[in-house]
A protein has these predicted regions:
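Aromatic, loop-rich ligand-recognition surfaces of beta-strand-rich domains
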Residues: 16, 460-462, 494-564, 569-605
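C-terminal beta-rich recognition modules with glycine/proline-rich loops and embedded aromatic residues
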Residues: 42, 101, 167-175, 180-272, ...
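Short beta-strand elements bearing conserved aromatic residues within extracellular beta-rich modules
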Residues: 281, 309-311, 545-547
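Short, small-residue-biased leader/transition segments that mark boundaries at the very start
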Residues: 1-8
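Non-catalytic carbohydrate-binding regions of carbohydrate-active enzymes
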Residues: 92, 99-142, 146-201
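Core domains of carbohydrate- and sulfate-ester-processing enzymes
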Residues: 32, 37-62, 103-118, 197, ...
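Carbohydrate-binding/catalytic loop surfaces
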Residues: 17-32, 57-80, 118-142, 185-209
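Well-ordered alpha-helical scaffold segments within catalytic/enzyme domains
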Residues: 21-34, 80-95, 107, 133-137, ...
């Protein structure tokens, strides 16, 4: 296989991988074998992008890699390629590669990175969106992309030695990555959205099963991310109870960590063995302790708090200037030495850059490295209608028997709705938050990470409608069926902030949806908001559609007097017809020959 890679694709066919990852493997082969041909081949594959017959953004082949400065296209392919670029940059010292991967990283962390550490905003191509395009309900954030993001930041740390890369890695690890697997290890998320109305549930397997196998491979590799060694420097990058045997200057060193991190900020690092004499222990001081949500202005803390930290060696406080985010202790260590680190850990509120439209007027809540969310099992009200106080105060509640042991956050909030006269109402409630990674373990229902603090961002519970009170059935029975009558409509054809239903992967077929009313009703119009994810997705507006009603004999009949069955994107397509008294109506659609169809909402009046 490696012989083919290093000969066939150089001498006979100038081609590059359609799905990047070979570059990382080749760099690793170079490190293991010392054979230059593997590193040369990794660089060759990267160098050829932008010069082959395939020049699309989807596969990051739109321009030479050293000219790229924005994360685009399929997020998993991109992350694997960026990790390969970081490998080549570090192993060759090529400044063009170093500058390119630094530019791309700046773009991700500054404009395309979710508060949960996820990347890849849209299901349309499983891709990065535009700058600051970070929707919540439709956030894709593929589990594999989160793993790829860890790969990228780990390699950039190895290249530059700066703690900011581990700040990003840690956020991804504790939130948008481990959310991809259930607490018992038996269910998996492909996408990891930041908001839900109940259309998401972990699955035991997928037809395209990259995520389950990927995360099952990644988790056992985690011990390798805790420490790093360079010459006589030992980097302590992650905080978890462990015993590790290291080589420092070729000599054996054994360290033991004891901690309940991330639930509290106390970490003890003990020296069990040291044959290396004097070395520098570099302890990462996380960005969240230093009042930095992420190493950019994409997110900032909004509560005005200032956290602090302390470091003691054998009970005595020590001081040190931070260097690249690390607290450095240089000494001749001996067996039995103990370093006690304390990080203040309080609930914090976060706001997004105002350019992130989906998060304007909203706050997120985190404590330490953990991002929290509101979920339905802990709250006896619609969590999507929550309205946060201006300066919320949080109580931390330990729940050792809930979801394998978590901390909940509780605070006072309000629920917004409308009374019978259409006036806005606010009801005081006690809101409970749980760690984002632990959501969707107690059944399907509503969840939200970003919580409104401005009326313009709120979503008051809407009055019930005939459609919302109806029983929904469809020819394709999936979780997203709940989107059909959730009373949420898109503001335009590109709005992915509301959920949708589709018939994918069926193509060219006749499909249907039906409403069974609570009681007999007279209806005379239907409005449909079509879903179309061109150009990369597989859904297009239908060829045609019709409305049927159920007659007294229980048979479906087409409505009469229909004026127009519209198929416009981004707006409601209303058909008016002769009034009919019935217990049920049906929407029948004919899909395009080579595509599926879908819809955001179906209203009846």
């Amino acid at each position: 296989y490696t012989l083919s890679l290093t000969t066939l694709f150089r001498s006979q066919q100038i081609r590059v991988p359609g799905h990047q990852i070979a570059e990382m493997a080749l760099a690793k082969l170079y490190l293991v074998t010392g054979q230059q041909k593997y590193l040369d081949q990794a660089k060759f594959f990267l160098d050829q992008r932008g010069y082959t017959t395939r020049t699309d953004e989807y596969s990051q082949a739109h321009k030479p890699v050293v000219e790229q400065d924005e994360a685009v296209g399929h997020a998993v392919r991109a992350a694997y390629m960026y990790a390969g670029m970081a490998d080549v940059a570090a192993l060759t010292g090529d400044t063009a590669y170093i500058h390119a991967i630094d530019r791309i990283w700046d773009n991700i962390v500054g404009k395309k990175y979710y508060i949960t550490g996820g990347i890849g905003a849209t299901s349309n191509g499983e891709a990065f969106g535009k700058n600051y395009e970070l929707p919540n309900m439709s956030a894709y954030c593929e589990t594999c992309a989160a793993i790829g993001n860890v790969y990228v930041n780990y390699r950039l740390f190895l290249l530059h030695g700066e703690a900011k890369y581990y700040d990003v890695l840690e956020r991804t690890l504790y939130n948008g990555l481990i959310s991809g697997v259930s607490l018992d290890g038996g269910g998996f998320f492909y996408p990891n959205p930041l908001e839900s109305i109940g259309q998401h549930q972990r699955q035991p397997w997928f037809g395209c099963a990259c995520c389950p196998s990927n995360i099952c491979r990644f988790i056992p590799s985690l011990p390798g991310y805790v420490y790093a060694v360079k010459d006589k420097d030992v980097y302590v990058n992650l905080f978890m109870s462990n015993t590790s045997n290291l080589k420092v200057g070729g000599k054996a060193v054994s360290l033991e960590q004891t901690t309940h991190y991330p639930w509290n900020g106390d970490v003890t690092i003990g020296v069990n063995k040291n044959n290396a004499g004097q070395f520098t222990m570099k302890i990462r001081i996380p960005g969240w302790v230093r009042n930095q949500v992420v190493p950019s202005d994409l997110y900032t803390y909004s509560d005005g708090k200032r956290l602090s930290y302390t470091v003691k060696v054998n009970g005595e406080p020590v001081q040190s200037e931070l260097k690249d985010g690390y607290f450095c202790i240089d000494r001749r260590w001996k067996k039995g030495d103990k370093v006690a680190v304390h990080f203040d850990m309080e609930p914090r509120t976060v706001k997004a850059n105002n350019k992130v439209e989906a998060d304007r007027g909203r706050i997120a809540v985190e404590r330490g490295p953990i991002v929290y969310c509101a979920e339905w099992p802990d709250n006896d009200f619609d969590v999507l209608s929550v309205f946060m106080n201006r300066t919320p105060q949080f109580e931390v509640v330990e729940k050792p028997d809930l979801l394998y042991g978590i901390n909940q956050l509780k605070t006072d909030a309000q629920i917004l709705g409308y009374d019978d006269r259409g006036r806005l109402t606010a009801t005081d409630v006690k809101l409970t938050l749980i760690p984002y990674y632990a959501w969707a373990h107690r059944g399907a229902g509503a969840m939200a990470v970003w919580l409104p603090q401005e009326l313009s961002a709120s979503r008051p519970t809407m009055p019930a409608t005939l459609a919302s009170e109806s029983k929904v059935d469809a020819s394709h029975k999936v979780k997203s069926i709940s989107a059909i009558n959730d009373r949420l409509v898109p503001k335009d054809e590109n709005d992915r902030s509301v959920p949708y239903y589709h018939w994918w992967p069926k193509q060219g077929t006749t499909e249907w949806i039906s409403y069974e009313f609570p009681s007999e009703a007279t209806v005379s119009s239907a409005t449909v908001y079509w879903y179309d994810d061109a150009p990369w997705g597989g859904c297009r507006i239908p060829q045609s559609w019709k409305v049927y009603y159920k007659d007294a004999q229980g048979q479906w009949q087409p409505v009469s007097g229909a004026d127009k069955y519209g198929v416009e994107k981004g707006t409601g397509n209303t058909v008016n017809f002769d009034p009919v008294k019935t217990k049920a109506v049906k929407l029948e659609i004919v899909q395009p020959a080579d595509n599926s169809s879908g819809l955001f909402e179906w209203e009846v009046k």
